Amino acid sequence: MDGIKTLQPRQPYDAPNWVRTDRSVTFAELKTYEQQLQSSGLVPDAITVALNLPPDLYLLRANGIDMDLKYRYTMPPVKDSSRMDISLNDQFLQSFSLNSSQDVNKLILRLPVLQGLLDGKSEVTIPALRLGAVNQLRFDFQYMNPMPGGSIDNCITFQPVQNHVVIGDDSTIDFSKYYHFIALPDLRVFANAGFPYSRMADLSDTLVVVPKAPTQGQVATLLQALGGIGSQTGLAAINLQMTDDGNQIKNKDADLLLIGAIPSSLKDDTKINLLVEATKSWVKMPMRHYDLASIYPDDEARTPNTRTDITSSGPMAAVIGFQSPYNDQRSVVALLADSPRGNELLTNALNDSGKRAAMFGSVAVIRESGVNSLRVGDIYYVGHLPWFERIWFALSNHPILLAIFAAISIVLLAWVLWRMLRIISRRRLSLDDE
């Protein structure tokens, strides 16, 4: 290979492995092999579709995801309880009867996300769902398959007939109505989706900062990190920038990936909560720590409460995420280790799905015993929301303020209506007087 030349610049969120978010997508585009959307058998195997999404899709006030589903199936011999069950991320959504008299098999659905939906009985019957970077949509076709009976004197032979089910390639799912907005730092989206670097699939918005004389372990860590991001996006990192001069980062509008050490220009104790220096480091512990990555503590809970000095005789590594001091829409992730064995632990952790699942928050400490993550320090936001969505987002974590805001809005609306009625009434009276 003599070289790579980019013929057309990449666009944000156009990674080959991600579902398009600028338009509706057909199921044919989501297939990874030819026969994926069909199944056969007495009880057909489930049909599954992977939905790999950008982790910064803003779904806080989403009513659901629109899906236009077209499907075909072998009709049951009689009208019975045969059905199609739809599940998302192993959570049941809804079932539809396989009616033997049905002519057109087309459904226009709205997949619920975050909040439960109300059915016609005004009861919450659909569970709240949460979309992640990797999701699985599953269709189970359940056939009753009645078998004729016999007796000792009258033996009946029966040949089971296979059932065939197909999800149409022209079925569509639409994520184009949602904004891109996320709270960071969150090492979970870096470890499992390569975000924010994977926003540009070719890493054209990424600047890698390496030591002037990187060790073999640091090079291995770098290659593992870039390879992991490429496996998530489906595209090689052909346009990333790399430097060994920490002073160059001030003039770059890019997300920074630091390998081995933090440049002196970025050392800010208010943003960096862990420094790996030889075998000694310190960690600021928050007021309250949550083991579940899905729980985001409030500002008070994230405030450092104690400072713990750690002296470790064993190897140690760390992954740290914080906001770039040069651009409030850019992020920094540092991959640090204290020794060659620490680099090996870090590289292995980035290659281990179980250890990556344990990374979240702003700091992940990696030792021989495993991965420990903390969420501490300042939160910043990357992406764009319209002003009205910003208001709802700001009030979402403050229900009392939301109630006060709603009450004031109702009072103002009532006052406006009252004034309008008064004006109309006066006009009518003046016309009557004339």
Please place each PLM-identified region on the residue numbering:
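Solvent-exposed alpha-helical segments and adjacent loops
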Residues: 1-434
